[in-house]
Amino acid sequence: MFNIKMTISTLLIALIILVIIILVVFLYYKKQQPPKKVCKVDKDCGSGEHCVRGTCSTLSCLDAVKMDKRNIKIDSKISSCEFTPNFYRFTDTAADEQQEFGKTRHPIKITPSPSESHSPQEVCEKYCSWGTDDCTGWEYVGDEKEGTCYVYNNPHHPVLKYGKDHIIALPRNHKHA
């Protein structure tokens, strides 16, 4: 009986020592990993990385949007987006006009200018970029020649839905994220 008690207590001590060793090794390994690189723009990051909420990341654009824009709702038909220097850009996507974000959009008619070589989408993006920090997104509806730009300045979280021939862009690392 004494042998059995001693064996159980020995096993228990060995198990505790093993758990302590595993914890020490795990904590040491965590300390050895380099800290995430701090950034303001994509150029601050390495190849294949993008600046998401102030740190360099290899997240896909869609995952980055979900991390950057808390409580965003994205229709399941929307499966991708692209990084641009200042925006997350979605094609065939529109804001849901029944939700708070979509209710307060402001239209801006864009017509081609012979002196300008910018596409209507570029003009729409520049309008939002040159505006105040209150621009929380832009949407373009039209073709390559002319269309309507909608500028959003509502800090509510966007609800995005599928919208054929719509382009919507949400600012990256924005104060209303």
Swiss-Prot record:
GO terms for cellular component: host cell plasma membrane; membrane; virion membrane. Residues 1-7 are intravirion. Residues 29-177 are virion surface. Keywords: Host cell membrane, Host membrane, Late protein, Membrane, Transmembrane, Transmembrane helix, Virion. It is a single-pass membrane protein. It is found in: Virion membrane; Host cell membrane. The chain crosses the membrane at residues 8-28. Belongs to the asfivirus inner membrane protein p22 family. This is Inner membrane protein p22. It comes from African swine fever virus (strain Badajoz 1971 Vero-adapted) (Ba71V).
